[in-house]
From Swiss-Prot:
Its main location: cytoplasm. Transmembrane segments: none annotated. This is Glutaredoxin. Residues 1-85 form the Glutaredoxin domain. The keyword tRNA processing does not apply. It is found in: Cytoplasm.
Length: 85
């Protein structure tokens, strides 16, 4: 299974929903990076994703996007293939 990295923030309902969806898909561990605690992490997230909002989700080296993008990927049947290439 690919490594899953998620940039998150405090009190983020979309972060919580994304974590639940990923755990339901069989992801046992998510590398969570809190951008509120580190300006460097926020800058890194922006550089890698081009976005300023959380969550930003990466599966392996692939930038999935936010929760809506992750949900769409799951609904279209592409999440499992990305998690288990």
């Amino acid at each position: 299974m690919q490594t899953v990295t998620m940039y998150t923030g405090p009190f983020c309902p979309y972060c919580t929903m994304a974590k639940r969806l990923l755990h339901a898909a069989g992801v046992g561990h998510i590398d969570e990076i809190r951008v509120d605690a580190s300006p460097e992490a926020f800058a890194e997230m922006q550089q890698l994703s081009g976005q300023r909002s959380v969550p930003q989700i990466f599966i392996g080296e692939t930038h999935v996007g936010g929760f809506t993008d992750l949900y769409r990927l799951q609904q279209e049947g592409g999440l499992d293939g990305l998690l288990n290439p």
